[in-house]
């Protein structure tokens, strides 16, 4: 039987755990401009986890790009999914760049998704939808961040639209939805006091969410150069956190600290158990 044609911009990943507990790629479908590196086992505290880095030879995403990313983490697997750098969003005559991401995390699996910051250029449009499906006993740690523009070029909130929507499901049932639409030039822009806006979504059904929430709030309070807040998802399915940062180093440090805090609570490694 012939496999379906791989569409432009398609990236499909399925990871499994082998008999030794190491995560391996079971299937991979990819087509320009989305490519991934070879699997890397580089987490000393969780040697079974694998890291995949998404690379874009095009240097960014264009106004007629339609990207689709599908990831499935099977029982016992642990995947770090990241990108090589920030996502540059170019302006053009098309309807705007679009990216749909669909993540499935089975019981006993973990997916950590931390792409680089989205940097929309002047007059560009970027639309993103993320669907997260987690079974009880699974874990999703997801991050997204958007910059005010190409700040080094003097571009600040000159883009047309940034539209990002998230739908989280647990055992097939929707537990949370979020959508942020930023249109520079509107009155609502007065609510944004920094040059970077970021979101952390943790879906961990069956975990101690109250302990996780306390730890993440403490980490956020201890951080410098950022401000934000965190709350629990319905049905104690996880935690939602949003923050604003003025500087890129502060944003990066906040992401590093928040992920480390979540891992200590939910994924104790050999140095943390």
Curated annotation (Swiss-Prot):
> What domain of life is recorded for the organism?
Bacteria
Entry's Gene Ontology molecular function annotations = nickel cation binding
- Might you report a single GO cellular component term? cytoplasm
Q: Where in the cell is it found?
A: Cytoplasm
Subunit details for this protein? UreD, UreF and UreG form a complex that acts as a GTP-hydrolysis-dependent molecular chaperone, activating the urease apoprotein by helping to assemble the nickel containing metallocenter of UreC. The UreE protein probably delivers the nickel.
* Role according to the record: Required for maturation of urease via the functional incorporation of the urease nickel metallocenter.
The name on file for this protein is Urease accessory protein UreD
Q: Which Pfam families match?
A: UreD
Q: What organism is listed for this UniProt entry?
A: Mycolicibacterium gilvum (strain PYR-GCK) (Mycobacterium gilvum (strain PYR-GCK))
Family of the protein in this entry: Belongs to the UreD family.
Presence of keyword Transferase: no
Q: Which UniProt keywords apply?
A: Chaperone, Cytoplasm, Nickel insertion
């Amino acid at each position: 039987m012939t496999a379906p044609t791989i569409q432009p911009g398609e990236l499909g990943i399925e990871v499994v755990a082998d008999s030794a507990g190491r995560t391996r790629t079971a299937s991979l479908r990819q087509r320009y401009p989305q490519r991934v590196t070879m699997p890397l086992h580089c987490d000393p505290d969780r040697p079974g986890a694998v890291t995949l880095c998404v690379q874009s030879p095009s240097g960014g995403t264009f106004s007629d790009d339609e990207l689709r990313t599908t990831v499935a983490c099977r029982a016992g697997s642990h995947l770090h999914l990241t990108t090589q750098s920030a996502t540059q969003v170019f302006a053009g005559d098309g309807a705007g760049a679009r990216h749909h991401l669909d993540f499935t995390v089975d019981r006993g699996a973990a997916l950590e998704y931390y792409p680089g910051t989205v940097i929309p250029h002047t007059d560009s449009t970027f639309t993103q939808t993320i669907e997260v499906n987690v079974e009880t006993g699974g874990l999703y740690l997801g991050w997204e961040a958007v910059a005010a523009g190409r700040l080094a070029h003097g571009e600040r909130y000159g883009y047309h639209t940034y539209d990002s929507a998230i739908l989280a499901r647990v055992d097939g049932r929707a537990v949370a939805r979020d959508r942020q639409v930023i249109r520079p030039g509107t009155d609502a822009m007065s609510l944004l006091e920094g040059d970077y806006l970021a979101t952390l979504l943790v879906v961990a059904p069956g975990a101690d969410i109250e302990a996780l929430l306390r730890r993440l709030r403490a980490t956020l309070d201890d951080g410098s150069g950022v401000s934000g807040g965190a709350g629990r998802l319905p049905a104690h399915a996880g935690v939602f956190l949003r923050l604003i940062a003025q500087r890129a180093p502060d944003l990066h440090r906040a992401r590093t600290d928040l992920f480390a805090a979540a891992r200590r609570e939910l994924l104790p490694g050999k140095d943390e158990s």
